[in-house]
Design a protein with these regions (language model features):
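A short acidic, Gly/Pro-enriched loop at the edge of an enzyme's catalytic core
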Residues: 111-112, 174-188
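Helix-to-beta-strand junctions that scaffold the AdoMet/dcAdoMet cofactor pocket
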Residues: 135, 230-232
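Conserved class I S-adenosyl-L-methionine
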Residues: 111-122
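Class I S-adenosyl-L-methionine
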Residues: 180-182, 235-238, 242-335, 340
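Mobile active-site "lid"/loop adjacent to the S-adenosyl-L-methionine
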Residues: 148, 186-225, 237, 241-248, ...
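Polybasic, low-complexity RNA-engagement segments
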Residues: 1-45, 49-50, 299-441
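S-adenosyl-L-methionine
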Residues: 143-180
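Conserved SAM-binding loop of SAM-dependent methyltransferases across substrates and taxa
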Residues: 123-136
Length: 441
């Protein structure tokens, strides 16, 4: 059992998870990762996906459905479907969707949500969850330290259609320059990735206890920085995709015992299969929000998450609650002092778009840059709604000589959601779907 898993890993989970290790090791060793979910974001058209076989609803997210793909060999990739490109739906691993449930609880409790930070945002699934709870007038900063992963985040946000996100490239341990700025912070910590062994076996080959301890030291630095950036009364969601205590409960307990952070109170139904931290460590109160998703027990990959609050009595910050939200450019300039704002970040005009590189000029008369995504549909703009075949061709970059095209800029839509732009000048037609997002023919 577990022949390809590191021996040291097996010994450790057997010690730390005595009642759950057998199911965990068996699942990691013998089962294929199949717990993908499709989450509806706008109108939902998952049945366009070849071989799509919907399963049950995800218990902790009622807009997400488990699915499989019958005869998956040779089928088109998920991202090649126009519904995905239009932002109608998003595919995400099931356990990570627990973040949505935690955010629901925070909203019910009246937690502040006007200034949010996703500290390790790529590829963007949890950023989308934060956007669901961002109030009108709020701003979300999505930060990613790795250059090649910023492009993934950029594409996800373009498809989402949000105009309230500033993307930045910043190390997660470098937020102390904005003391007490954020109402809420989500950090999906860099970790040893033990929860992904079933999905990525190569991760097990690179695993070692020394690597786990090195990452735990980095996590500690990140927590120091994020704590400074969190306002008194604010909240923090801590997450990893690993099992070891040193990267999870071991990180949080010093903050709790010192009184600098307080765990939120939240319970989950037992039949969801999540394992509470108190089962493994008696220092945790069963009412405190901290759980593991354990393959073999939970219908999801390995994942840990917890919710904590910064006491109101903590030192006040230098940023009055509303001061920096009146104009997005103010926040952008504040961030520029501390880090690189990715591709200009959020434009300074009221309907700013998050990624100027993806924007297409919509005539000199309008003086702004329309974007891909569902919010690019504007009154008075020439619109051509495409069927599945034409939408696929458009996303491949083909120039479609459609009779409905008017001279100038035309917005291509799919099921009413914006895909991108075609430009016609007489008999000449040019496809302006971003090259970085085009799907293979």
């Amino acid at each position: 059992m577990g022949q390809w898993l590191p021996d040291e890993f097996i010994r450790r989970v057997t010690k730390e998870f005595p009642d759950h290790a057998k199911a965990l090791i068996h699942s990691l060793s013998n089962e294929t990762a199949t717990d993908r979910t499709l989450r509806c974001l706008q109108v939902c058209s998952p049945h366009e996906i070849e071989g799509f076989e919907p399963g049950q609803r995800v218990p902790w997210h009622q807009e997400a459905t488990y699915f499989t793909r019958g005869g998956a060999e040779g089928l088109r990739p998920i991202h090649s479907y126009p519904g995905y490109q239009a932002g109608a739906w998003y595919v995400q691993e099931a356990a990570g969707l627990m973040v949505h449930r935690l955010l629901e609880h925070l909203r019910t409790e009246g937690a502040p949500m006007e200034r949010l930070l996703d500290a390790c945002a790529a590829p963007g699934g949890k950023t989308l969850a934060l956007l669901d709870f961002l109030p009108k007038g709020g701003i979300l900063v999505a930060s990613e330290p790795m250059e090649h992963r910023l492009a993934l985040l950029d594409a996800t946000l373009a498809r989402s259609g949000s105009d309230r996100v500033i993307m930045v490239q910043n190390q997660a341990q470098n937020w102390q320059g904005l003391p007490g700025f954020f109402d809420g912070i989500l950090v999906d910590m860099p970790c040893s990735g033990e929860g992904m062994f079933r999905k990525h076996r190569e991760a097990a080959k690179d695993w070692s206890m020394d690597k786990s301890l090195t990452l735990a030291a980095l996590q500690s630095k990140i927590m120091d920085s994020l704590y400074q950036a969190l306002r008194p009364g604010g909240w923090l969601i801590y997450a990893t995709c690993t099992f070891g205590k040193e990267e999870n409960t071991g990180q949080l307990l010093p903050w709790i015992t010192s009184g600098r952070l307080e765990p939120a109170a939240l319970s989950l139904p037992e039949d969801w299969g999540w394992v509470h931290a108190s089962v493994l460590d008696q220092r945790w109160n069963p009412r405190h929000a901290a759980w593991w998703s354990i393959p073999g027990l939970t219908q999801g990959e390995g994942f840990f998450c917890s919710v904590l609050r910064k006491p109101i009595e903590a030192k006040r910050n230098d940023y009055p609650p509303k001061e920096t939200l009146q104009e997005p450019s103010i926040l952008r300039e504040e961030l520029k002092k501390q880090m690189r704002v990715y591709k200009g970040g959020l434009a300074s005009h009221p309907s700013g778009y998050p990624s100027p590189e993806l924007a297409m000029a919509y005539g000199k008369k309008h003086g702004h840059y329309p974007q891909t995504g569902p919010w690019s549909v504007e009154e008075g703009c020439p619109i051509v709604d495409l069927d599945k075949t034409l939408a696929t061709w458009f996303c491949q970059g083909q120039n479609l000589a459609l009779g409905e095209l008017r001279n100038g800029w035309n917005l291509m839509t799919y099921q009413g959601l914006g895909l991108g732009w075609m430009h016609r000048e007489g008999t000449r037609v040019q496809n302006h779907f971003p090259k970085s997002l085009r799907i293979a023919r």
